[in-house]
């Protein structure tokens, strides 16, 4: 019984940050155009993570895109700037997106 409790606590500790970042993405309206595993208006976060995989400065590059927007990378629909997202929030969201496998 004790081992089961430890396993549950460990799982909760790992999943808590995932839920926090998903909540932040929802609060900042990211989820209006993106989903974790499927393309909506914009690419899935899984696809974004794959595109930036292995790049040393991926968190900073993606954070800049989240704040300033961009166009031409994922098709004809541009991503608008997101002035409601602070630099710290953008980096937190970027790290979360890049962790998705």
Model-based region annotation:
Residues 19-36:
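Sequence/structural segment immediately N-terminal to covalent heme-attachment motifs in c-type
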Residues 32, 41-52, 65-94:
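Axial heme c-ligation environment in periplasmic c-type cytochrome domains
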Residues 51-61:
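Short microdomains enriched in Cys/His and/or Lys/Arg
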Residues 96-100:
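C-terminal alpha-helix
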